[in-house]
Structure formats: structure tokens, C-alpha cells
UniProtKB/Swiss-Prot annotation:
VWFD domain ranges (all copies): 362-535
Xref: SUPFAM superfamilies: FnI-like domain, Serine protease inhibitors
Protein's GO biological process: blood vessel endothelial cell proliferation involved in sprouting angiogenesis; BMP signaling pathway; endothelial cell activation; inner ear development; negative regulation of BMP signaling pathway; positive regulation of ERK1 and ERK2 cascade; positive regulation of SMAD protein signal transduction; positive regulation of sprouting angiogenesis
Record-given protein name: BMP-binding endothelial regulator protein
Residues annotated as signal peptide: 1-39
Disulphide connectivity of cysteines: C364-C497, C386-C534
Annotated glycan sites: N30, N116, N255, N318, N441
Main location: secreted
Organism this protein belongs to: Mus musculus
Oligomer status and interactors: Interacts with BMP4.
Cross-referenced InterPro entries: Kielin_Chordin-BMP_Reg, Ser_inhib-like_sf, TIL_dom, VWF/SSPO/ZAN-like_Cys-rich_dom, VWF_dom, VWF_type-D
Location of this chain's protein in the cell: Secreted
Length: 685
């Protein structure tokens, strides 16, 4: 897509640097979406003229930008700006060539032809050799046939033999129909001419480091997580994983694969053992053989409820790798490379069998009055009192998830606080409310709660929601919210938490897709429209950090001074506390009498230190635990679903409602007007 704009002259005199153009001072109009009519209202001069129709013009400071090209059109200088297309979400390696305007997904060059990523092809000269391009890597391998009968038929011009009939495992398949035998997602069979032909999928070699790859559910081959962005390398060099290889350089990828850098494309050839030596103990590539062994000679291994053929390998429990060797299962422990620390931007992940350095997840924090710290590290304050989109997936029209926050003023004119958090995931709505109350689709629930798509539990003093979509939400039951986004969501999110692309300068992109220069305009653009009345009295401006009496200021600084104490000192050199200190003072200056408003800033700073692997000595349970219920109630993750009140305390009968998490009156007390009291103190009926 091209955007056109004209070039105007402030003074009409010959331009010495650009022949044929009658101006020396040039201004671009309509570069940033400014309407031409509006721009012309405050600019004077005339459109720059030129002589040679159709000539491409070089204009200093304008055409230096590779996205802008100026031509002589109708005797006037007309410039066009290229608008870059959005790259596919499946693109794992985006490159930008020097002098080019737009990024593109890294493809492959092979034998003089160019191929897009994910493209597979075979040539007439080598019909049984499969080639596939995946982000700058061409994987060459033989077509791997799977034969399940004693009398397979060979066909001229076909790579794989076929077996008679289209009945497999008792199921009759139609002509042309494809299926996966035994639920094996790596083998595809098809019914062709009344016979069955089966092929094993060959996984392409990936360009990303191993720790950035994963195998999606229901698929055979791994894919790269997220998207890496690099400049195209000169001299035909290749980027493979985290290393750069010179043009012509070769290396052994594994026992079965040799890779060579050829003109910026890494060509990896997988060798396959001949069927006659498949049973050789020295053959390291036996699992890559064509399975042309008669069924009675095929040795299989049963492991649990699964059947594995000879040579197949699989991961087992307790970090073991198992293999089927001549009908016997052999297992050994995975050998881990010791890792003690990670480079900047990486975090040590100990969740798997072996500790590895992985990309840090994005973290967005909301706390206090409220203060927002985006995924990319931009900090701002916003005191709106409605419901807003904190984050959602903007990479698809129908967002698979979104997180909403609802704010209220809590009887103040200048500030607001986060009152509740709402996670909308598919057909489920999870509400995290005050005092750690949890509702699922409107009903209060007990903890822990497990579903196929999310898990909710109390983690210390925080309520934690973990989703399969890659989001993790922590809530303290008061006004602290932390959203953690997995690296594969990078560049896909939007909302008050920003777009998570690694650059905080463009975090203020509003709900209409336009950049906002004012924080309030940005935040209001993410307001959720509803019929609920959410306005408050006219907002009182706050010209300084802390308005109020001397007593209020002294209390604010006295409480917030603890951030500078020995409890947090071990973290000061790694995480700057000044922003948290200012937020703390702001919160304390209009803090309700019954609240410890410094807690949110302390908690936010503690979490930031913990993410850097630094332990601080501050314990929120001592003075800030949100689980400390008020008016005699106690917190229970599975309290009674039937509430005892002054009206029903002496009724006898079982409670058929499920237990729920939240604040409950102890067994010897009843609830009356929001307080837990003894039954004898109930008013006379």
C-alpha cells in the first residue's frame, strides 16, 4: 500500500542540490495521517515543480528514508510512502535488508530459486527427495514410507509401496481420504486406487535455538516460539540458532544431518540408512530407515498403554529417554548441561528436566492509586473509575482472551484504585474480587480450581490464575494486579499494559489503533462501554506529589521510607526503588484511615526484585496481607457455601451448596450487617 503526499516550497527559487525542483526548503505533508486540508491551512508556499515527467527524484532528507520515493508527476514533485504489510504470526524470523523499507519473513534460496517459509517441494529429477523451507533453512530428506502389510506393491514413478484395501484397524476409508493410524500424528495414510499408502512426516530443521521451540498440541513437529528480528547478513552468511556461519561453511547438526551455508540459506541434508543395515547396532540413524520390514519381523515394545516400533525413541517420566531396541525397552536419564546463570534478558527456567536459559516473560503491574507499569517498562498513572481493557490478544479479530480491570474512587476526588479483575477466556469469565473472592461465570467457587484451560489457586498471599493461553494473573485481593505474558505472545497484545514488543516508546497506542500523546486519552480509549454508572465528582487536580496537612505528609514519608531500609537494600543496586517510592508517597497522601496504602508499592517492588532472583526480607503477611478479613471474619479457601446469619443460625439441616473461597465467620459466630457476632447478640425478632 502506498500513501501519497506532495512537496511544498516555502520560497520559490532554484534549488542547487536537486536540479529541476524549484525549492530549497521542503516540507512533507500527510506523513503522519494529517489531512491535507488541515496541513495546508498553516503552511504557505506552492507545490514544488519539476521538469522531467516520470523521473525518480533524489531529495535530501526525504528520499534518504527507504520507504519514501519521489517522482515527477504532472510537472509536480509527488512522493509516495510504502506502508509495510503485517507479517504472519507464524513467522519466526523477520529480516530487514539494508536499504529496504519493510521487514519480511526469512525465506530460502535453493539452486537459483526463491521459496517462502513453510513451502515444501519435490523435483521431477528426484521425486523421492522432499525439500522444505523453514525460516532460512532448507531441510532435504528422503520420503519415508511406512509399510504395514506382508505383500506391498511397488509402483513405477511412486516413492512408496501400497498395501491392498482401504480398511485399517477395522475402519473402511473412502477413496482419497487421509487418516492417522493408531492416532500417530506423525504418520499420514491415504486411500489411493483402493490401496493404502502411508508416509512418515519429516520434521524440518528449525533456525531458532532449541529452548525457543515447542511442539504445539496435536502436531508432530516442533515450531519456533515468538519472532526474532535481524538484519539480513552480508556476503551470503547464514544465521542458525544463535550463531553466524560464513557462506560455504559446513557442520554436523546431529548423527543423521549435515548442514551447509549456501548464499544466506542453510541447507541441511538428512541421511537415511539403507533397509539392509537397519538392524545394525552401529547405525545411529536407524530410526530414519524406510520401514520395509515384514510385519512378523518387526519387534515392538509396549510401554504403558503405547506400542513403539524397533528404533523409536520417546521421553518418559522422571526425565528419562527410552528407546525400543530389538523388542526391549531401554531407558536412561537425560544428561543435563550445568547452568548457573543466564545472560541479560534471559531467565533460568527449572521447570523442565534440565535447567535452561529462556527469554524473560513480559510483566505488567498495576498497583496503588493506580500506577501502571507496562510489559515494556513504561510507567504512568491513571485515575479513571470505570472498567478498562488491561490486555488482550490483538493479533486476531476475535481475541481468544482479554483481561479487564474495574476501578473505583474509594471516596476520594483525586485518586482511584483497582477494585476487581476479570479474565475472559473462551466461554469462561473468571472474576477476582475484593478479599480474594473468586467467581466463575457468576458463581463463587472454592480453591483450588482446575479446568482444561486455566488453574486457580492461592499462592502464598496472592491469588494466582494460570492459563494455557500463556497468561498468568496474580491478585492480592485489594488493588495489586500482576499479569505475566509468555514470550510467544510478544507483539500480539494491546491494552493499558501496552503492546509487548520490547519498545516502550510506542506503548500508548489506543483502542482505535492511533498513538496517543496524552495518557488520559490513551487510557480512556481502552474503556469498556457498559450501562454501569462509573463517573465520580469533578476531579480535583493534584499539582504536587503530596497535598495535605503536615501530619499527612509526615506519615506518608515515614511509612514509605521503609523502602530505603535494610529489608530492601539487597535489591537497590539491581532494581531502582525511586519510582516505587514516589508511587508510595502518592498513595499515602489520600489514603483512607483504615488502609495501609504503602503495601501495594512495597509488594510491587518485592515482586520486581524476586523476578531478578533477589530475595528481600519484607514479609507482607505481617501488616499487608489481604487475607486478613475485617470485622471478625477469617479467610478460607473452602469455606461453607451456606452463610449463617441472625435469621437462620438456629435452623437445622445440611448445606447442599459447594464450599467457596473468601472471608467467612468462624463456626461460633454469625453474620449480621457485615460483621461476625455471637448469636446471643442478634437483635430480637
Amino acid at each position: 500500500m502506498l500513501w501519497f503526499f506532495s512537496v511544498r516550497a516555502l520560497a520559490e527559487r532554484p534549488c542547487r542540490r536537486s536540479p529541476g525542483i524549484t525549492c530549497c526548503v521542503l516540507l512533507l505533508l500527510n506523513c503522519s495521517g494529517v489531512p491535507m486540508s488541515l496541513a495546508s491551512s498553516f503552511l504557505t508556499g506552492s507545490v514544488a515543480k519539476c521538469e522531467n515527467e516520470g523521473e525518480v527524484l533524489q531529495i535530501p532528507f526525504i528520499t534518504d528514508n527507504p520507504c519514501i520515493m519521489c517522482v515527477c508527476l504532472n510537472k509536480e514533485v509527488t512522493c509516495k510512502r510504502e506502508k509495510c504489510p503485517v507479517l504472519s504470526r507464524d513467522c519466526a524470523l523477520a529480516i530487514k535488508q539494508r536499504g529496504a523499507c519493510c521487514e519480511r519473513c526469512k525465506g530460502c534460496t535453493h539452486e537459483g530459486r526463491t521459496y517462502n517459509s513453510s513451502f515444501k517441494w519435490q523435483t521431477p529429477a528426484e521425486p523421492c527427495v522432499l525439500r522444505q523451507c523453514q525460516e532460512g533453512v532448507v531441510t532435504e530428506s528422503e520420503v519415508r514410507c511406512v509399510v504395514h502389510c506382508k505383500n506391498p506393491a511397488e509402483h513405477q514413478g511412486a516413492c512408496c509401496p501400497t498395501c491392498p484395501g482401504c480398511v485399517f484397524e477395522g475402519v473402511q476409508y473412502r477413496e482419497g481420504e487421509e487418516f492417522q493410524p493408531e492416532g500417530n500424528k506423525c504418520i499420514t495414510c491415504s486411500c489411493v486406487g483402493g490401496r493404502t499408502q502411508c508416509v512418515r512426516e519429516v520434521c524440518p530443521i528449525l533456525s531458532c535455538p532449541q529452548h525457543l521451540s515447542h511442539t504445539p498440541s496435536g502436531q508432530c513437529c516442533p515450531k519456533c516460539l515468538g519472532q526474532r528480528k535481524v538484519f539480513d547478513l552480508p556476503f551470503g552468511s547464514c544465521l542458525f540458532r544463535s550463531d553466524v556461519y560464513d557462506n560455504g561453511a559446513s557442520f554436523v547438526y546431529d548423527n543423521c544431518t549435515v548442514c551447509t551455508c549456501k548464499d544466506s540459506t542453510m541447507v541441511c541434508k538428512k541421511k537415511c540408512s539403507h533397509p539392509g543395515v537397519c538392524n545394525s547396532d552401529e547405525d545411529a540413524c536407524c530410526e530414519d530407515c524406510l520401514l520395509r520390514v515384514p510385519p512378523e519381523d518387526i519387534k515392538v515394545c509396549k510401554f504403558g498403554s503405547k506400542i513403539f516400533r524397533d528404533g523409536e525413541m520417546w521421553s518418559s517420566v522422571n526425565c528419562s529417554i527410552c528407546a525400543c531396541v530389538k523388542g526391549k525397552t531401554e531407558c536412561r536419564k537425560k544428561q543435563c548441561v550445568p547452568v548457573s546463570s543466564c545472560p541479560q534478558g534471559k531467565i533460568l527456567n527449572r521447570k523442565g528436566c534440565c535447567p535452561i536459559c529462556t527469554e524473560k516473560p513480559g510483566v505488567c503491574t498495576v498497583f496503588g492509586d493506580p500506577h501502571y507499569n507496562t510489559f515494556d517498562g513504561r510507567t504512568f498513572n491513571f485515575q479513571g473509575t470505570c472498567q478498562y481493557v488491561l490486555t488482550k490478544d490483538c493479533s486476531s479479530p476475535a481475541s481468544p482472551f482479554q483481561v479487564l480491570v474495574k476501578n473505583d474512587a474509594r471516596r476520594t476526588r483525586s485518586f482511584s484504585w483497582t477494585k476487581s479483575v476479570e479474565l475472559m477466556l473462551g466461554e469462561s469469565t473468571v472474576s477476582l474480587q475484593q478479599h480474594l473472592t473468586v467467581r466463575w461465570n457468576g458463581s463463587r467457587i472454592a480453591l483450588p480450581c482446575h479446568t482444561p484451560h486455566f488453574h486457580i489457586d492461592l499462592d502464598g498471599y496472592l491469588l494466582k490464575v494460570t492459563t494455557r493461553a500463556g497468561l498468568e494473573i496474580s491478585w492480592d485481593g485489594d488493588s495489586f494486579v500482576e499479569v505475566m505474558a509468555a514470550p510467544h505472545l510478544k507483539g500480539k497484545l494491546c491494552g493499558l499494559c501496552g503492546n509487548y514488543n520490547g519498545h516502550k516508546r510506542d506503548d500508548l497506542i489506543g483502542g482505535d489503533g492511533n498513538f496517543k500523546f496524552d495518557v488520559d486519552d490513551f487510557a480512556e480509549s481502552w474503556r469498556v462501554e457498559s450501562n454501569e454508572f462509573c463517573n465520580r465528582p469533578q476531579r480535583k487536580p493534584v499539582p504536587e506529589l503530596c497535598q495535605g496537612t503536615v501530619k499527612v505528609k509526615l506519615r506518608a514519608h515515614r511509612e514509605c521510607q521503609k523502602l530505603k531500609s535494610w529489608e530492601f537494600q539487597t535489591c537497590h543496586s539491581t532494581v531502582d526503588y525511586t519510582t516505587f517510592y514516589r508511587s508510595c508517597v502518592t498513595d499515602m497522601c489520600e489514603c483512607p484511615v483504615h488502609k495501609n496504602c504503602y503495601c501495594e508499592s512495597f509488594l510491587a517492588y518485592t515482586r520486581a526484585c524476586q523476578r531478578e532472583g533477589i530475595k528481600v526480607h519484607w514479609e507482607p503477611q505481617q501488616s499487608c496481607a489481604a487475607t486478613q478479613c475485617k470485622h471478625g471474619a477469617v479467610y478460607d479457601t473452602c469455606g461453607p457455601g451456606c452463610v449463617k446469619t441472625c435469621d437462620n443460625w438456629n435452623e437445622i439441616g445440611p448445606c447442599n451448596k459447594p464450599c467457596i473461597a473468601g472471608c467467612h465467620c468462624p463456626a461460633n459466630l454469625v453474620l449480621h450487617k457485615g460483621r461476625c457476632i455471637k448469636p446471643v447478640l442478634c437483635p430480637q425478632r
